Amino acid sequence: MEEIKNITDITQSALAELEAITDLKDLEAWRVRYLGKKSLLTGALRNLASLPIEERKAAGAAANEAKAALEAAFLQKEQISKEKQFASRNEGLDITLPGRPWPIGRIHPLTQVTNEVTTIFSSLGFSVVEGPEIEDDYHNFEALNIPEDHPARENMQTFWIDRPNDNGRLDTLLRTHTSPMQVRYMEKNKPPIRIVVPGKVYRYEATDATHIPMFTQVEGLVVDRGISMAHLKGTLMEFCRRFFGANRKVRFRCDYFPFVEPGVEVAVSCTCGGKKECSVCHGSGWLEILGAGMVHPKVLERVGIDSEQYTGFAFGMGLERLPMLRYGIDDIRLFYSNDTRFLRQF
């Protein structure tokens, strides 16, 4: 029968072409030519409609067998071709080698330093407490013996929140130091008191290598009977020894802070050795890390603590300056740059 012979010829020709194919692109073209909607085999099937019924059945069966044979041959060839392609791509791949490690995150250096500082003071008997970052005028200034005409109240140094009180006066702000928590804690707790307060503080300052508008501070407060300047110096010297090591020089100098009397500035020797080009110490050889002093009697009296019976000391340190001194970092802005090349060193 001519139709069956035609189907057989198409099948044999298709299988011969399939055998010679080595590329997946050519294989897809073969599929369209012999198994697609407009394929040669489909064209042969259209001619069966004019045949007598018996011949049509025989030719139809032959066509279905041919199509099944071609589909099976195509799938087999496709599988073999894909395996060969995969093997050629991975010819130089050693699957016994370990995989590439996934990048692991690190704790931010400021978080590390905060944890280390609070751990040191905890071992010295201090409790760790936290306070609000949005403060009121009373706790941030007035209760700490900072009068209304003090420069720190000016808009140029304080971020005031545009929310006037009933008198039309701005009295809500982003805290300029962690010292307000001194007052809040003493309002609710009686001596003996020994606390440290870590947290973010905000000041409207020009940005440079050692100053930024938002930074981290740790406040310390001790109130008890018989507390003296010797206790303050001993505590801070011990902290500096544990954090910086015994070989680092520590300097105490008189300074003024409204909420302490007397006040001192504590500085640590710079890693540069006093070089004039140093952007951290500016050639002085020292970097101030904290201000401290004996708690002013007016501060104690405001919270109902008898300043005749109790004395205390307080200190506040900028945490960013500690790793700057320890690791020789010359720009405080690096801590907030989100540069992973810098951060993954710690």
Curated annotation (Swiss-Prot):
EC numbers on record: 6.1.1.20
Cofactor(s), by name? Mg(2+)
Q: What is the lineage of its organism?
A: Bacteria, Bacillati, Chloroflexota, Dehalococcoidia, Dehalococcoidales
**Leading EC class:** ligase
The molecule here is called Phenylalanine--tRNA ligase alpha subunit
- Indicate the quaternary assembly: Tetramer of two alpha and two beta subunits.
User: Which UniProt keywords are listed?
Assistant: Aminoacyl-tRNA synthetase, ATP-binding, Cytoplasm, Ligase, Magnesium, Metal-binding, Nucleotide-binding, Protein biosynthesis
| Record-linked PROSITE patterns | AA_TRNA_LIGASE_II
Q: What are the binding positions for Mg(2+) in this chain? A: 261
What organism does the record attribute this protein to?
Answer: Dehalococcoides mccartyi (strain ATCC BAA-2100 / JCM 16839 / KCTC 5957 / BAV1)
Recorded family membership:
Belongs to the class-II aminoacyl-tRNA synthetase family. Phe-tRNA synthetase alpha subunit type 1 subfamily.
What GO biological process, any one, is recorded here?
phenylalanyl-tRNA aminoacylation
The entry's localization annotation reads: Cytoplasm
Cite a single GO MF annotation: tRNA binding
Reaction(s) catalysed by this chain's protein: tRNA(Phe) + L-phenylalanine + ATP = L-phenylalanyl-tRNA(Phe) + AMP + diphosphate + H(+)
Q: GO cellular-component terms in the record?
A: cytoplasm
Cofactor note (record) = Binds 2 magnesium ions per tetramer.
